[in-house]
Amino acid sequence: MGIKRYKPTSPGRRGMTVSDFAEITKFEPEKSLTEPLKKHAGRNNHGHITTRHRGGGHKRRYRLIDFKRKKFDIPAKVAGIEYDPNRSANIALLHYTDGEKRYIIAPLGLKVGDTLMAGPNAEIRVGNALPLANIPIGSQIHNIELTPGRGGQLVRSAGNTAQLMAREGNYATVRLPSGEMRMVHIKCMATLGQVGNVDHQNIMIGKAGRSRWLGRRPVVRGSAMNPVDHPHGGGEGRAPTGMNPKTKWGKPAMGKKTRHNPRTQRFIVRTRKQK
């Protein structure tokens, strides 16, 4: 993938970059693998905002992605690489020899015409999915399950990759992109290779309107609000907050640990903060 730059014909164009979509080979989605995607603008079933700064954006259809890769020992040919508006990674359309079609996250280096397979007996090559018990130590992997059969939950966004570091007993140790070292059951599936579309992180949005196309609404600083709206609000002119950073609801912000899951804490060998 390459980056396309625009001439500075306007302040919004200056610095704006887009993907050149060189990897994309198919421009219309497989209709049988899509479904309507209703917009909620960050609201829950009561109509209350639970996620701020969401709303608007271009209409989308959801692409049904196969995160489980449970069609074992059935070869599939890559029919196309497509853009997916619902995620940063591109997706690949697979045509299985039994006639079924499925989408997967497109790994780096996958090309149209490649043959992929999933299962314990699959070949060690990019795009194939195997249990962690059957993947060589040191391999780059993505789309990693946390619970066997549940489907990939970790390392799914553009350019990301994890590394299989060790295996001991029923657990494998995986180094995640954040630097965290985590134990995952060896029956969990993972896909070989790195997620494609690696230049996604280098794209410059360029102007506010382009964020609105993506469904992102403006973010207002607390210090620019009134005291009734935010703990940082009020004062004459640009006033200091006079306190440790707080959220809009008075909770500690910036640096406060928010992880509260002691059940899975024992699976974390090293946190992302430890060196």
Curated annotation (Swiss-Prot):
InterPro entries: NA-bd_OB-fold, Rib_uL2_dom2, Ribosomal_uL2, Ribosomal_uL2_bac/org-type, Ribosomal_uL2_C, Ribosomal_uL2_CS, Ribosomal_uL2_dom3, Ribosomal_uL2_RNA-bd_dom. SUPFAM superfamilies: Nucleic acid-binding proteins (SSF50249), Translation proteins SH3-like domain (SSF50104). Pfam families: Ribosomal_L2 (PF00181), Ribosomal_L2_C (PF03947). Gene3D superfamilies: 2.30.30.30, Nucleic acid-binding proteins (2.40.50.140), Ribosomal protein L2, domain 3 (4.10.950.10). Residues 39-59, 254-275 have a biased composition (Basic residues). One of its GO terms (biological process) is cytoplasmic translation. GO terms for cellular component: large ribosomal subunit. Keywords: Ribonucleoprotein, Ribosomal protein, RNA-binding, rRNA-binding. It comes from the Bacteria. Residues 38-59, 222-275 are annotated as: Disordered. One of its GO terms (molecular function) is transferase activity. Belongs to the universal ribosomal protein uL2 family. Part of the 50S ribosomal subunit. Forms a bridge to the 30S subunit in the 70S ribosome. One of the primary rRNA binding proteins. Required for association of the 30S and 50S subunits to form the 70S ribosome, for tRNA binding and peptide bond formation. It has been suggested to have peptidyltransferase activity; this is somewhat controversial. Makes several contacts with the 16S rRNA in the 70S ribosome. This is Large ribosomal subunit protein uL2. It comes from Herpetosiphon aurantiacus (strain ATCC 23779 / DSM 785 / 114-95).
